[in-house]
Curated annotation (Swiss-Prot):
The keyword Cytoplasm applies. Transmembrane segments: none annotated. GO terms for cellular component: cytoplasm. InterPro entries: Arg_deiminase. This is Arginine deiminase. Gene3D superfamilies: Arginine deiminase (1.10.3930.10), L-arginine/glycine Amidinotransferase, Chain A (3.75.10.10). Belongs to the arginine deiminase family. Its EC number is 3.5.3.6. The gene is arcA. GO terms for biological process: arginine catabolic process to ornithine; arginine deiminase pathway.
Length: 406
């Protein structure tokens, strides 16, 4: 079995991809944060220290931590990768042929450390030292971005997701995040950890416009035993689910996909903001999605490249059947209705399981953490006063690359 393999949500976590908050978050302001999909601006230094505590907690549990910036630097050292990234991101269509040529030349002469920082963190016109005959830069304001920052790269879960023996390079819903996928495409193609390794690229690795076939990793739970649970949120579409399912079945990597239609609002942005897998038979669930009237479907391979789509009445029963369990242990968000809503907003349900029954979550969610503890789940708490303002918890901020089956 390849080491590039994720067989579950709760098996021993062995290797994970994180992205420490740095330059991109310094470009967040009250006037642009909503366009960049943040509700607020963060104290970047404090957020970095909180993230370091998260990474250290993972290392203490024996998990190898890979950092996105480091992988980008290594990938840019491969000439073919550097050329591809500059060609795809600094195109004539985006910038016009004159400015694109000048900008590519400027960026190609940077050292790889600096270039990785710019590609991830953005570049304003006021920070650009070159002159160009193009009309475009003359029409821009100093604080306009030449290269938009990617603060949502903090949430490495979404851009790519490993599902059993392969990875989906996800076509993201929002323009503010779509460039992120190119970075992961380059890393998985050329970085020494991944180059030449035996793994499948299910979806999203082609130079295509994916139209409405969007999927994000926060909606994808690899619940094990050949089953995948996917939420259809405001960021993941039925078209995206069906395309990923078709490729999982084509490569024999999944037996079934359970798809749940989620409420379309900010607090329910992804499935993992309202539901995570904590132990073989235990899930954390926000009460709002306990409703039995949530539309649910079961997708299975039919042969000849076709799929069968079956409407279901209860997604929890579907999970029980997929995992061969008689009963699921459901832990709902803690506190009264007010406290539960506050803690869900602060990612109480968005925990990262490092091994069966042991999870990482924000220390601020005291009511929910207490419920987890009483149910026999060990919570390794991390600070999240700044990170939590980005509306993502430990699961959102991590992309497992190697994890055991259950």
């Amino acid at each position: 079995m390849s080491k590039l393999y994720v067989g579950s949500e709760v098996g021993q976590l062995r290797r994970v991809l994180l992205n420490r908050p740095e330059r991109a978050l310094t470009h967040l302001t009250p006037s642009n944060c909503h366009e960049l999909l943040f509700d607020d601006v963060l104290l970047v230094e404090a957020a970095g220290k909180e993230h370091d505590a998260f990474a250290d907690t993972l290392r203490q549990q024996g998990v190898e931590v890979l950092l996105l910036h480091d992988l980008m630097v290594d990938t840019l050292a491969v000439p073919e990768a550097k050329q591809w990234l500059l060609d795809v991101q600094i195109s004539d269509f985006r910038y016009g042929p004159i400015f694109a040529r000048d900008l590519r030349r400027y960026l190609s002469e940077m050292d790889n450390e600096h270039l990785a920082t710019i590609l991830l963190g953005g570049l304003a016109y006021s920070e650009l030292p070159i002159q160009s005959a193009s009309m475009l830069p003359r029409m821009k304001q100093p604080l306009d971005f030449v290269i938009e920052p990617l603060p949502n790269h903090l949430f490495t879960r979404d851009t790519s997701c490993w599902v059993y023996g392969g990875v989906s390079l996800n076509p993201m819903m929002k323009p503010a995040r779509q460039r992120e996928t190119n970075h992961l495409r380059a890393i998985y193609q050329w970085h020494p950890i991944f180059a030449g390794q035996d793994f499948i690229k299910y979806f999203g690795n082609e130079d295509l416009h994916y139209d409405n076939a969007n999927i994000e990793g926060g909606d994808v739970l690899v619940i094990g035993k050949g089953a995948v649970l996917i939420g259809m949120s405001e960021r993941t579409t039925p078209q995206g689910v069906e395309n990923l399912a078709a490729n999982l079945f084509k490569h024999g990597q999944a037996k079934e996909v359970i798809a749940i239609e989620l409420p379309k609002h900010r607090s329910c942005m992804h499935l993992d903001t309202v539901m995570t897998h904590m132990d073989v038979d235990t899930f954390s669930v926000y009460p709002e999605i306990m409703r039995k009237d949530l539309h649910t479907w079961r997708l299975t391979p039919k042969g000849n490249g076709e799929m069968q789509v079956e409407a279901l009445h209860n997604y929890l029963h579907a999970i029980e059947r997929a995992l061969g369990l008689n009963h699921l242990n459901i832990i709902t968000t803690g506190g009264d209705s007010y406290e539960a809503e506050r803690e869900q907003w602060n990612d109480a349900n968005n925990v990262l399981t490092v091994k069966p029954g042991v999870v990482i979550g924000y220390e601020r969610n005291v009511y929910t953490n207490e419920k987890y503890d009483k149910a026999g789940i060990e919570v390794l708490t991390i600070p999240g006063n700044e990170l939590g303002r980005g509306r993502g918890g430990a699961r959102c901020m991590s992309c497992p690359i190697e994890r055991d089956d259950i």
